């Protein structure tokens, strides 16, 4: 496996290279900035690349953009845990980077060893991933400024809810689906995206700027409103519950029983207890692992509606594949088609999610 490490710090390049040397059959080269990286990508043609963001001569985002045009390859961003780092990293994911690792301590090389296993795991996985550049669709400032404001669902006796489970490759996929939903989509939507805390806040803010629907991070107990999108808080789990008889969601401490956080499994299980399977619309999207597969299969078997992203369109197909192994009959599609399916299901059911057989 040919790995290119791109960082303006010689010490950081050495530290990252030493971490990656433990990958079997790894052949590693380094680049000191974006221009050096592009030159080595074209001449050496690496299988995967790690990329810093802040560099002289040519920064990481400019380098990433040019590589995605000239010779796309899987790129893992190394970024800080700051809010600014989260915003820039999200932009990189939209531009085509397949994954990221948040560096503890920012530029402190010594602390990089804390995430050494994660760096190796993500670089190995990235080498097998599909590279996808998400098209940036524009929404006018006027459209965003006058978002569709829906009332709190006070008479929603069946407590109807839509849930998206997503991990690696998720931000662009989620935004594509939400952009293709009508402004009057009548269900609250919870997006469970595996991300650190500072990144989910930046993700929710980005979606809120770019979408017609209001978007909020679940950073406290919130009563769920129709037509509003909710992003689970990173480094926490999220559960669905009732507050004064109204459907609500709230963050909870991580449950060590689950491997990924926020946990799709825990979220969907709580939604089943609170709403019942037949009042749920669940969508499984791109990502590693099998988080939420068992619980979404239970929803499908309990007369709820479950869709999965077509695995061939995923950056990482593991999560949809895990669900399809359990319930192979559920509909699949591209992000755009999933938005169409969600819209049709909700329109046809009018006010109740009783769909019968799939």
From Swiss-Prot:
It comes from the Bacteria. It catalyses: [protein]-L-glutamate 5-O-methyl ester + H2O = L-glutamyl-[protein] + methanol + H(+); L-glutaminyl-[protein] + H2O = L-glutamyl-[protein] + NH4(+). Residues 2-118 form the Response regulatory domain. One of its GO terms (molecular function) is protein-glutamate methylesterase activity. Phosphorylated by CheA. Phosphorylation of the N-terminal regulatory domain activates the methylesterase activity. One of its GO terms (biological process) is chemotaxis. Keywords: Chemotaxis, Cytoplasm, Hydrolase, Phosphoprotein. It is found in: Cytoplasm. Its EC number is 3.1.1.61, 3.5.1.44. InterPro entries: CheB-like, CheB_C, CheY-like_superfamily, Sig_transdc_resp-reg_Me-estase, Sig_transdc_resp-reg_receiver. GO terms for cellular component: cytoplasm. Involved in chemotaxis. Part of a chemotaxis signal transduction system that modulates chemotaxis in response to various stimuli. Catalyzes the demethylation of specific methylglutamate residues introduced into the chemoreceptors (methyl-accepting chemotaxis proteins or MCP) by CheR. Also mediates the irreversible deamidation of specific glutamine residues to glutamic acid. In V.cholerae cheB2 is a pseudogene. Contains a C-terminal catalytic domain, and an N-terminal region which modulates catalytic activity. Belongs to the CheB family. This is Protein-glutamate methylesterase/protein-glutamine glutaminase 3.
């Amino acid at each position: 496996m040919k790995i290119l490490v791109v960082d303006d710090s010689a010490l950081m390049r050495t530290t990252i290279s030493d971490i990656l040397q433990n990958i079997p059959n790894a052949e590693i080269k380094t680049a000191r900035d974006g221009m050096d990286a592009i030159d080595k990508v074209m001449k050496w043609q690496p299988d995967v690349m790690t990329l810093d963001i802040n560099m002289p001569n040519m920064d990481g985002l400019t380098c990433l953009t040019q590589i995605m045009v000239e010779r796309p390859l899987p790129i893992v961003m190394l970024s800080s845990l700051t809010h600014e780092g989260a915003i820039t990293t999200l932009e990189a994911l939209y531009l085509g980077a397949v994954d990221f690792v948040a560096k503890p301590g920012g530029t402190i090389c010594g602390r990089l060893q804390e995430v050494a296993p994660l760096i190796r795991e993500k670089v190995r996985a990235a080498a097998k991933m599909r590279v996808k550049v998400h098209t940036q669709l524009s929404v006018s400032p006027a459209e965003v400024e006058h978002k569709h404001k829906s009332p709190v669902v006070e008479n929603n006796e069946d407590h109807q809810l839509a849930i998206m489970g997503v991990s690696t490759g998720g931000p662009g996929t989620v935004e594509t689906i939400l952009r293709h939903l009508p402004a009057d989509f009548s269900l609250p939507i919870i997006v469970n995206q595996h991300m650190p805390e500072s990144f989910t806040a930046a993700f929710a803010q980005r979606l809120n700027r770019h979408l017609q629907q209001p978007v909020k991070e679940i950073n406290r107990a919130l009563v769920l409103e129709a037509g509003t999108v909710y992003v689970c808080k990173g480094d926490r789990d999220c559960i669905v519950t009732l507050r004064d008889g109204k459907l609500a969601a709230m963050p909870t401490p991580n449950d060590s029983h689950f491997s990924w956080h926020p946990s799709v499994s825990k979220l969907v299980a709580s939604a089943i207890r609170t709403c019942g399977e037949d009042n749920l619309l669940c969508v499984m999207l791109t990502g590693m692992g099998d988080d939420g597969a068992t619980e979404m299969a239970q929803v499908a078997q309990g007369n709820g509606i479950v869709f999965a992203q077509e695995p061939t369109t995923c950056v990482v197909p593991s999560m949809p594949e895990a669900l399809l192994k359990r319930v192979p009959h559920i509909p699949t599609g591209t992000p755009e088609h999933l938005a169409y399916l969600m819209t049709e299901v909700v329109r046809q059911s009018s006010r109740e999610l009783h769909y019968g057989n799939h």
